[in-house]
Amino acid sequence: MSFKVVIEPRALADIQDGIDYYEDQLEGLGERFSETVDHYIRAISHNPHYQVSHKDYRAVPTGRFPYLIVYYLDEPAETAYVMAVFHTSQNPKKLPK
């Protein structure tokens, strides 16, 4: 069963920051980052319970980019809320609550 995915404003800003950063590093890399994030967000929709689970949230690593897509599930609404796209070098205490 697929869940609806809602991307919260902070996560949208995180994604745009990542795109801008990678595009500044190498032309086309920002687009690859965006495509990678989109791929994993679709994976969350199709299999929301699969990824790493923490007390208050779940997180899926983005493969070749050092980011986690942080989300929580609203089981009754069958919705996954993406709260952040979090660079793994950041302090985990900065994760949204």
Predicted regions and their residues:
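Arg/Lys-rich, positively charged N-terminal/basic patches that mediate binding to nucleic acids
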Residues: 1-34
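Alpha-helix N-cap/helix-start and coil->helix boundary motif
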Residues: 12, 38, 88-89
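Structural signal for well-ordered, non-membrane alpha-helices
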Residues: 16-19, 38-45
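Enriched for short, Lys/Arg-rich terminal
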Residues: 31, 72-97
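Basic/aromatic recognition patch in beta-strand/loop cores that engages polyanionic ligands
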Residues: 39, 47-79
